């Protein structure tokens, strides 16, 4: 098996503080990702909830691993199904957000790391384009909140 990551980055036309709020406020996160019980505190365990698919219950289990406002946020991202008994399709990954102020806004870099291929291939293929759309969703959520 090989380990791989999804990396998306974009300059958003907002300050780091506004983007940080979008990344760390439950209501804002629900607008661009999923309903959740997130709290920006290292060690906090939380869940994302979405529609179940196949053998997967629709719950992503997470824990805040690093939180350095308004620059860095990292959390574990675990879930998936091991209905086949092999555990190869279960996710045990991390998501890291890095915010860097630049002219005209903030450079946002998201790395979702730890996909073990080929076992996590279905999740990797589904999430790769999804994370790209998420950055636009964050920008929309910030604009709507203004």
What positions do the PLM features span?
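A short beta-loop-alpha structural element at the N-terminal edge
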Residues: 10-16
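Solvent-exposed alpha-helix faces
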Residues: 24-25, 136
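Hydrophobic-ligand binding "helix-grip"
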Residues: 34-40, 54-104, 113
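A conserved amphipathic terminal alpha-helix motif
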Residues: 114-146
């Amino acid at each position: 098996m090989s380990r791989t990551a999804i990396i998306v980055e974009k300059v958003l036309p907002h300050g780091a503080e506004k983007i940080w709020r979008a990344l760390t406020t439950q209501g804002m996160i629900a607008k661009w990702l999923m309903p959740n019980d997130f709290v920006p505190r290292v060690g906090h365990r939380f869940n994302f909830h979405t529609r179940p698919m196949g053998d997967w219950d629709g719950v992503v289990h997470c824990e805040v691993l690093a939180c350095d406002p308004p620059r860095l946020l990292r959390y574990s991202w675990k879930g998936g199904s091991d209905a086949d008994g092999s555990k190869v399709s279960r996710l045990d990954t991390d998501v890291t957000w890095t915010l860097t102020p630049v002219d005209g806004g903030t450079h946002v870099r998201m790395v979702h790391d730890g996909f073990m291929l080929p076992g996590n291939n279905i999740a990797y293929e589904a999430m790769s384009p999804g994370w790209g759309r998420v950055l636009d969703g964050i920008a929309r959520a910030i604009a709507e909140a203004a």
